[in-house]
UniProtKB/Swiss-Prot annotation:
This is Cutinase 3. It is found in: Secreted. The lineage of its organism: Eukaryota, Fungi, Dikarya, Ascomycota, Pezizomycotina. One of its GO terms (biological process) is carbohydrate catabolic process. Disulfide bonds join 44-122, 70-84, 184-191. Its EC number is 3.1.1.74. Catalyzes the hydrolysis of complex carboxylic polyesters found in the cell wall of plants. Degrades cutin, a macromolecule that forms the structure of the plant cuticle. Also degrades suberin, a specialized macromolecule found in the cell wall of various plant tissues. Induction: Constitutively expressed in a manner dependent on transcription factor FarB: levels are unaffected by varying lipidic or non-lipidic carbon source, or by oxidative stress. It catalyses: cutin + H2O = cutin monomers.
Amino acid sequence: MRFHTILLAALASLVIATPLPSDTDVSLERRQSMNSNDLEKGDCKSVAFIFARGSTEIGNMGFVVGPGVCSNLKSTLGSDKVACQGVGGAYTAGLIQNALPANTDSGSIKEAVKMFDLAAKCPDTQIVAGGYSQGSAVIDNAIQKLDDSTRDRVKGVVLFGFTRNLQDKGQIPGYPKDQTKVYCAVGDLVCSGTLIITASHMTYGLNAGDAAKFLASQVSV
């Protein structure tokens, strides 16, 4: 019973720390940036960026860091070279899934795998990926489930507020560490294997530019 009380308190802190923008605060441009479906639209470009948002974030890209990485990547490589795709569908970014052993649920992982498989259908596309908070666990687990040929086409991954940072020792099991960059802000207790959310967990938008540069350095365009 005590565990459930602590868990509920931790999940409640997630809601408090991740306020949803009100309708009056969200411009049309910002709402559009929170959703990106280039791969689902059939856009085969030189680079595909797949991103999984954090818990309670709206859209399929979220608003804390996903859209920023996408826009910076397009600015760096050229908007005609980059397709951005958020993980939506079965991945609802709910709170309770954080408490599962994989820090997310199997349906969400399968949804991300589906996006990687979609990108792999583009024969000349190099794949990069990212995830924030619960989304980092989604991407981590999804990459482990890819077949070898698809995983080999994933050139770089960025993880923000990595919820499996402690469990997976700051990397994605079975994926090259030098192709992975983990962002864990000072004071972000999520990176220490807890569900405790602090203000630091909301700061990763500051790393969007650096993350895009890292991903750009991993591909050849």
